[in-house]
Amino acid sequence: MNYQRSFEDLEFNAIKWWPQELSATVAEASVLPILISSQDLFISILKLSGTHPEQIFDVINAAQISANLFLKHLVVLADYGGEMIKRLGKEFQEIFPRMDSTLEYYMNYTFKGEQYTYIFKKLPIKGLDNSKLAIDGKAIIEIKPLSDLYRDMIMILLYGSTTEQFNLAGLEKCEIGTILGKNEIIYTYITQKYLYVSRITNGANTNSLGQIAQTYVCDILSKYLPNDYSVTRNGKILLSDLNSQDSTKTSFDILVEFADKKVGIEVSFQVTTNSTIERKAGQARDRQNRMHAHYYWIAYVIDGAGNFERSGAVRAICRYSDCTVAYSESEIAVLAAFIQEKFNA
């Protein structure tokens, strides 16, 4: 078998998105990739909802987007986090008035210069928080219908800034309804907001997502390799510097060892493009040369839609890799076969 894949071969075998069995774990570590992958659909819903203030509910249903995911988009854009949602729940009865006849809570708001009234269908409820709304962690991947609670929260996040109570519970942030149907403004507003959010959260998320990616590969390798093979995350090998007499410990995402034989493995799974793959590509030639000088081997597990957008970097890695595979179990099994072939030679 030819383990030295071309870019085209690797992409053909790639899965591009996180495997289903990891989706809950990944969602718990970071909701950002989920938001970005559904961003175009979210933008389309806002663009198509400019005729009347509650048209958005019809569009949400037609788009078949989960209500909690749509709400999460609004929460992120409004920067209306968990503490504010809790505060809204606790102060709801003090913030919004009630109908004299029915005692229902309501909200007077403005849409395109006209006054409207929304009667709350579910709020207030006890213990309003992110968990009840299923917008945090692994709950974000659950499919939730557009219930009365979601309708109430969506209306607040869209139009809260236009109410008389805008200065209470952070409602001044809830302004997205003012741009519904305004296509160019929507696109600029959302992309700028997500760029800001991405900068804040992506660094923190990259490490945890990288650990998830490495652990998954380790688990599958351990399943396919003999028990007397050592499979270690963040393993180090003492390698000679080819330009001097010095030796340094070089880290690999995963290190597989048996007797005096070693395979260093680098793992990169990026749904959204970033510079990690460029860094690995820049090191690829030197790392392979140093490993080969000790009669060791280097392999790469490369996947994710973001990585394949940086084709030059992936091509460089393929050129200086002894075995390159994608991220599915069947692909990692190919890597296991490569390791056994080398160790048994």
Curated annotation (Swiss-Prot):
Its EC number is 3.1.21.4. It catalyses: Endonucleolytic cleavage of DNA to give specific double-stranded fragments with terminal 5'-phosphates. One of its GO terms (molecular function) is type II site-specific deoxyribonuclease activity. Transmembrane segments: none annotated. It is an enzyme of class 3 (hydrolase). The keyword Ribosomal protein does not apply. It comes from the Bacteria. Keywords: Endonuclease, Hydrolase, Nuclease, Restriction system. GO terms for biological process: DNA restriction-modification system. It comes from Herpetosiphon aurantiacus. The keyword Membrane does not apply. This is Type II restriction enzyme HgiCI. It holds the Pfam family RE_BanI. The lineage of its organism: Bacteria, Bacillati, Chloroflexota, Chloroflexia, Herpetosiphonales.
